[in-house]
Amino acid sequence: VLLFDIDGTLITTGGAGRQAIVRAFSTVYGRPDACDHFSFGGMTDRAIVRLGLEQIGVAAADATIDALLTRYVELLEEEVWKMDDARYRVHAGMLEAIDAGHANGCAVGLGTGNVRTGAMTKLRRVRIHERFDFGGFGDDHELRPELIRRGAERGAQKLGVPLAEARVVVIGDTPKDVQAAQAIGAESIAVATGDYRADDLWAAGATHAFEDLSRPGAIEALLNG
């Protein structure tokens, strides 16, 4: 089971997701500054919205979070198509990795903090949404290890084996991806295509770390450990 993170791993969006969140807080609460003081790296959408609400002193009830996420997804559709191609792209080696996974009988899915609709919106912009038919998403759980577990369960189900018998590999670009993999007993392949260097990702405990998946040995590690 291969579970790919989206932001900073599969693709870079040029900040489209952050801009959509900023606009959502601005239109609903008049507070474009709600998320100014923290990084979104490795966070789930629900956790981002919850922390943003706390920053501006609004009670983070589930219904409040849901309403803001609905507005965010609407605005995200606009933001991803406003971004130019030079800033919105698929990272090196990712298409080859996805294709290799499918060709070798892997269950190839997503392991992302994005809510499902937001995930598909981001991937549709670069026409790779149809390569993934399952995953663990930010609307499965607010905590990354739990949504990764849900994605792994779905992948094992597709393979027709119990989760305990499946080799699960999480592909991500932050220590939080690595830690989520560790929490469920999965392997991790970390890529330095986001805000962290390969050394940082090794230090976090990654099973393997590469500058990107086009590097020698990366696809072999993905498929065979």
Where are the model-predicted features located?
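Non-catalytic pre-domain segments flanking phosphatase-related domains
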Residues: 1-4, 56-60, 167, 221, ...
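Active-site neighborhood of HAD-like aspartate-dependent phosphohydrolases
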Residues: 1-41, 53-55
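Substrate-recognition/cap helix-loop segment adjacent to the acidic, metal-dependent catalytic center
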Residues: 26-28, 52, 56, 98-109, ...
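A short, structured active-site edge motif that brings together acidic residues
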Residues: 36-41, 64-70, 129-143
